[in-house]
A protein has these predicted regions:
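Short beta-strand elements
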Residues: 131-132, 210, 216
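Short hydrophobic-aromatic micro-motifs
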Residues: 158-160, 211-214
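Short active-site loop/helix that positions an aromatic residue
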Residues: 200-202, 213-229
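Feature representing long, continuous alpha-helical segments
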Residues: 212, 232-235, 292
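Short, conserved aromatic-histidine micro-motifs
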Residues: 226-245
């Protein structure tokens, strides 16, 4: 009636699979004990050892599942005739899969009890601001609380994003009740409080950014130790001047997009520092500066800075 249109940038998947953590998130937890490492790696070790022995694990790792909507011909054949995985070709695929998982595990990609889901603000607070004109809306979620329907009320959740360079392990309390389920329960998003600094810690906005939400008692305990006295980093980022759009400006923008934003050298330097036997206050300060440089580099094509 009003000639309005809506555009979906990203659509939430019907099925969200379990995720793997990465080395950047693990390297900032610098005081893990050998016993804790053994517990954290247990799921990945069991998964690797069960390839070819456990039917369900084997099929899942080969992508032969009902929720895989884009199966290859090989996967379709296995769905029709599962015994095919005993064929020589299938055995070769399993060997390569196992080799890949071992390589990933050595590189810090470990199986965890978590998944990636969209980040969303407290939309109840947004409605208070938008429709009621409240300049400081209260919302439903308090500071330190999140809502994610895939977890129970009272669960402690680690909320993580990549790139993860500084110590960015916010642990939040999941809150669920009838009122919260009514307002937030239609999606699998993780909803964050408008009173919380979590958006500053993780450097996210709400235009399709995703978060790795983990429920793990050991990782949570380690993270709490390492997050003691850690406050969010804050720095003013430069902004590009406004220009009239023309072919030349569009061309220069595309050129910048393909030639800027190489954060690899910066993040590699951060990893080298975290790899030291003992992390001193001076090294933490250097990591803070490099983290800022990394974020400036990521947005350099937009800000025309650096």
């Amino acid at each position: 009636n009003f000639g309005c249109e809506i555009c979906y940038c990203n659509i939430e998947e019907d099925y969200i699979s379990k995720a793997r953590i990465n080395y950047q998130m693990l390297q900032t937890l610098t005081d893990m004990t050998d016993d804790e490492i053994e517990i954290i790696t247990k799921k990945s070790v069991e998964e690797i050892e069960s390839i070819g022995n456990d039917y369900q694990t084997t099929m899942r790792l080969l992508g032969v599942t009902d929720y895989n909507t884009n199966k290859s011909n090989f996967q379709e054949a296995l769905m029709i005739y599962p015994e095919l995985f005993k064929d020589q070709y299938s055995r070769d695929v399993l060997k390569q899969t196992k080799k890949s998982l071992v390589k990933q595990a050595k590189a810090g990609r470990l199986r965890v009890n978590g998944h990636y889901t969209f980040l969303s603000p407290d939309l109840y607070a947004f409605c208070e601001w938008l429709f009621l004109g409240e300049k400081n809306p209260k919302g439903l979620l308090e500071d330190g609380q999140v809502y994610c329907r895939d977890y129970r009320d009272g669960d402690e959740l680690a909320c993580l994003r990549s790139p993860h360079l500084y110590r960015e392990w916010p642990i939040r309390n999941n809150v669920r009740n009838e009122e919260f389920d009514k307002w937030f329960g239609m999606t699998k998003c993780v909803y964050t409080s408008c009173h919380d600094t979590i958006s500053r810690i993780l450097q996210f906005d709400n235009d399709g950014d995703k978060c790795l939400v983990i429920k793990d008692r050991i990782l949570t305990k380690i993270a709490k130790r390492n997050m003691k006295d850690i406050v969010p980093l804050y720095y003013e980022m430069k902004k590009a001047k406004g220009e009239n759009l023309n072919n030349q400006v569009l061309y220069e923008g595309m050129t910048k997009a393909f030639t800027c934003g190489n954060v690899g050298p910066v993040s590699n330097n951060v990893t080298k520092i975290w790899n030291h036997d003992k992390i001193t206050p001076q090294e933490i300060k250097a990591i803070k500066w490099l983290c800022m440089e990394s974020n400036f580099t990521i947005d350099s094509a937009k800000t025309l800075y650096m």
